[in-house]
Amino acid sequence: HGQKIQDKAADAGVTPKEYVDKIVATVKDLWKLLDVSYDRFIRTTDDYHMESCQKIFTKLYEQGDIYKGEYIGHYCKPCESFWTDSQLVDGKCPDCGREVYDAHEEAYFFKTSKYADRLLKLYEDNPQFIQPESRKNEMIAFIKQGLQDTCVSRTSVKWGIPVPFDPKHTMYVWVDALSNYISALGYGNETYHDYDKFWPADLHMVGKEILRFHTILWPAMLMALDLPLPKRVFGHGWLLMNGGKMSK
């Protein structure tokens, strides 16, 4: 889901679903080539996942952790990240160095700032929660500079899960994607029943460019939902080709 896929599909002259279906086919072929088997191929376009996400979003809204407002700032389409003026580096995305564009639209926000102190306490009480140490220090510095509430919906993006009580909005792709960790286990749906068996996760192994989502936004969401947190998050570096990050 998200604007990046929506725009790529439009450029290719196909629907977003048709566009991602082709990518899924190549990923499955890659697993065969690598002799990798799996119990279930999980996609965020699955109906059960949509059901779970809508329940999560509604619960957070009803308990006051999500509110409606207006987003005015910048957006990096490749990273799918929102940024303020002060966070940009030479006017560009601080994560990838690409151009950002101005964004101004009605949106819902998650009260990430409400959980800043709890997140810092989490890192202090559980020093192994974020690894390696250098990445943990980056996340602490990010929070201490002033944690902003997170824009969690878009009206300009149609390729996404609709907000159930305000369907002109679709959920921000990272709220959708992170929720997949527990929706695939059956949280918020009756399709699967593995949540108690497999959650919390022992480890999230993620690229360093998405560590912020996994160690700030995701734990804050879980705290708001009163759910257990993953035990550790490891932010690994990149495989490089010609001096640049290999695309995932």
Annotate each PLM feature.
Residues 1-129:
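N-terminal, positively charged nucleic-acid-binding surface of large information/translation enzymes
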Residues 40-43, 48-52, 78, 96, ...:
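Structured secondary-structure scaffolds
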